[in-house]
């Protein structure tokens, strides 16, 4: 009997309130790194109706107009009208940053196990994942969920569907047969819109047609769409009130959207607003880099990496590889190859992936992984041939 199951992942648009917060936090980080890439940054953001609160810990020599950075980010997303719930020109922006604790800084500056190296900025566990379901070596449900909300923004910004507003969510339910993607069972797309697209609580018929034909169908592989595929477009109907007016937004609340859509475990640490001495971010990027190179090398069809750290200690507590039976050599041997070819100490990660750069705002919407952006060094597969040769393949 075929191993037939359904698996679902979701994504949210750049105008979703939590993603607005993430993008502001990473825009702050980038603005600081443009002047002082050795800064320590933990920038948190809250968004609500007409209000942005910036808080956290920042130690830097940079001089940044944090309020203007927040406004510019909100403008770029498309919140330029008070009818949308927040307007970059008129919203209140409150700033409440402290400096990084000296107690934390001493352990990061000089690792207890290697005084010349950088210690991990906190304890914790991180996961990386890759699989052969898509050319980008990402799970198909999260990959296509991202592409749906990304296209929503494109159609909104270029004027092809001018009734769209910034807030949106997508969800893709994939049917698997024999452990491989077979077809799409259900697509959910909810998007904020201008008032004339609804009659009472219901949407006008042309709205459904435009979303299905212009937004959804161009994104998804035709071979995965069947007569049984369900389209749920704005299933609750009217969606005029959205963004920070519809829900309070906070940095770090979309960690599954940011990673693999639930296809592998998550260590719990968010990414946005954090400089790369925080292993929550940098080690998760490194784990993706490792996993992707293992799959690209043909050592496994899917690969999950777990790493863990202790605060102030450079070397990871463990590097564990799981290939779920798809590996061509034992997982323990793959783990030894990882230790030999990747420096997963915090300083090693920062150097390996060139992370002391203002590259982070782009990561804060549409996923940190599975995107072939030139700044996303963790998406390179430059170690694949080395790993393949070392494995004797």
From Swiss-Prot:
Protein residues bound to Mg(2+): 18
Gene Ontology biological-process entries: one-carbon metabolic process; S-adenosylmethionine biosynthetic process
Pfam families referenced in this protein's UniProt entry, alphabetically: S-AdoMet_synt_C, S-AdoMet_synt_M, S-AdoMet_synt_N
This protein's UniProt keywords: ATP-binding, Cytoplasm, Magnesium, Metal-binding, Nucleotide-binding, One-carbon metabolism, Potassium, Transferase
Family annotation (SUPFAM superfamilies): S-adenosylmethionine synthetase (SSF55973)
Catalytic activity: L-methionine + ATP + H2O = S-adenosyl-L-methionine + phosphate + diphosphate
Listed CDD domains: S-AdoMet_synt
EC class (word): transferase
Keyword match Metal-binding: yes
Main localization, broad class: cytoplasm
Binding positions (L-methionine): 57, 100, 247, 278
Gene Ontology CC annotations of this record: cytoplasm
Cofactor(s) needed for function: Mg(2+); K(+)
EC number from the UniProt entry: 2.5.1.6
Annotated binding of ATP, by residue: 16, 167-169, 238-239, 247, 253-254, 270, 274
Residues that hold K(+) according to the record: 44
Entry's localization field: Cytoplasm
Cofactor note: Binds 2 divalent ions per subunit. Binds 1 potassium ion per subunit.
Single GO molecular function: magnesium ion binding
Family to which the UniProt record says this protein belongs: Belongs to the AdoMet synthase family.
NCBIfam families: metK
Subunit structure: Homotetramer; dimer of dimers.
PANTHER family, per the entry: S-ADENOSYLMETHIONINE SYNTHETASE
Protein name: S-adenosylmethionine synthase
Lineage: Bacteria, Pseudomonadati, Pseudomonadota, Betaproteobacteria, Burkholderiales
